[in-house]
């Protein structure tokens, strides 16, 4: 987290030690960006490469999660902790910065969608959403379909369907006692009364996604390496 590095550098009397994982030749690699931040704040920076050689160890890592866990970033988190503990015993993670200060790219997407809602009437957006269902299900058209679909609804309803659309949920939850009345949007709109939709989304991610995903991941993988990580 560049924000965490900036704040920690401001209050520290000595240069910070910073660490990151490098994914060579992949679009997920942020090591160059991390290096730029390190240079700007004059930290002692170390990056560790990760590649397919770690795959045979993944089943063992899964066993140490203690529960079903659907975030594959626990794998690089484990190897980062494994390397960091060679130099320090307590580390500060960057967790929480994106949720508190709207750092995720998805927040920009939500803001763009919201600007479209303000610009075009419901009838136009609904018609485009219906037409988008005729597009083929391909990688290049998926984002366009999602954009048109999301703009059929208000911001919070669209946010609550970011993983599965309502038709997809209807297909998955089509039996037994599963509820299909979609109460999430009403809940999210009132997550923090009196603030705008972006603050509600950030707080929802902070109190749910970060707590039930990010902190669990970091806690399991850091303790597996006898490293204490604080957020």
Feature annotation, model-predicted:
Residues 1-185, 220-231:
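ATP-dependent adenylate-handling active sites, centered on carboxylate activation for C-N bond formation
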